[in-house]
UniProtKB/Swiss-Prot annotation, chain B:
Disulfide bonds: none annotated. This is Large ribosomal subunit protein mL52. Its main location: mitochondrion. It comes from Drosophila melanogaster. GO terms for biological process: mitochondrial translation; translation. Component of the mitochondrial ribosome large subunit (39S) which comprises a 16S rRNA and about 50 distinct proteins. Keywords: Mitochondrion, Ribonucleoprotein, Ribosomal protein, Transit peptide.
Amino acid sequence: MSFSNLLMKSGLTVAVRDAQAAVLMTATRQGHTIRGKPPGVARSLEQRIREENVEDPEVVARINIGFPQLKESRSAQLKKRLEHLKSQRSDKQLEQLARSNKLIIDLDKVQRTYVKTTGQHDLRLVADHYGIFEHLFGSAYFVPRVPLNISYQLDGDSLAPVYNGNVIKPTEAAKAPQIDFDGLVDPITGQAAGQDTYWTLVASNPDAHYTNGTAECLHWFIANIPNGKVSEGQVLAEYLPPFPPRGVGYQRMVFVLYKQQARLDLGSYQLAAADYGNLEKRTFSTLDFYRQHQEQLTPAGLAFYQTNWDESLTQFYHDVLKIKEPVYEYDFPKPYLTDQKFFPLKQPFNLYMDKHRDQKQVNKEYLERKLAKTHPFEGPKKPLRYPNAHPIRDVPSWLRTEIRKERLGTGRVQDY
Amino acid sequence: MLKITKICLASSATSTAQRSIALTAPRAIDQKWRAAKGLPENPNAFGPLTNLPDYTYLDGRPTPLGANQKRRLIKQQEIATRIVELSGELEFAKQRHERLKANAESEKQRLIRSKLKPKGHFLLKK
């Protein structure tokens, strides 16, 4: 009812005579009102966000640049699985082992079967989660068909394997890892290739470039690997250990294995021995490299790990890279400080004066006072056993407070 | 409730009718007849008595413009200048909109063309 009170009042007497009293009571509504549209009609948060972040499906469409995989039909797989199950159930020896709690499951065999079946798809999902494809290939992706076994040699007989994003310290990754993959198998059919195969291995770090945020740092480049023998490949860039700077957290080191159609001449990517530690020369772009050779190369294998700073990198920056070690720390905003007043009321004068001085100078003066009370050979004085039992006389009250707090170890001494 | 509505509507109509009466000079003229003839609403704003000079010289000299004539001429010039300016801005806005749309479309095409060649199951057809 949008009529004004005057009109309502003038017409009320007429309505009362003709209409019933119950009709009037329905004009008013008690209780709260729902703001906006009811829940079933209004847009949900997901819908609202989707409408605000409109994406063109043609632009964001992802492209598969990897190998397909030929598999037998599902009925054949099911038949094979059922036969395996039947043979397992009719195995008397297996039954005896199970009943006597002596059955040991061969986990290596389980791992091999997993790698052949769903392991590579899981690796693709993990790589998607860590942004490997997005930062290396843009809107492209691939399912790695060739399992890569990469491990770093540690002291003794220990190995640090590279899984799908585990953490390996720069100390453990100081030397070139051992790489093992089956180079004689066709990635599409899973059968023996029958002729010589050539592979290319690229190890790069998308997070390690200091000057170009979109480029990568090339850590290792081996081309024309014959039949999976990495040691016989052509090394275009010698292995450079990872060097994550202090304070930036974890960096990703990605190994990508490409299958070549034939022998390739990648001499233009050769890194001279004199430029081993030159980071600018190690600028690399996987997307540009692959775009240039995408008719001859197809990505077939993938492995990556994470690494962060440790103490051995100080020596590495000094000796190998020959640069000063960078340290990243958070740049906190400065606390707000009003202009200095001539008469700061209700402020302790010593704290107020120090607040407007250079903090480094204040720290220096504290250190000087501390060293002045320290004997050069006998060391600092022993702290008082009962600090408050020793009277502090003939000093101003603010200085008495300072001395008392210093003896107790509270107050400003904890700031230094 | 319907009766209340009727009474209120009647009151509103009465108030509106009373409040809408206006008495001004142009209203006394038969505007319908003038609109049918293509004449302006205000007879003094346009016409021979307004636009033509009040006198002429017998020897053919041009008559100087009157103050109001000059003011109307200047006003017309300003209006024409304003029309040209605003039309230019409108044309620029249209061209800019077309240019931005073409740029967005070309950028989208560039992104689509810069994608890598798809492989995957396409390799099986070789």
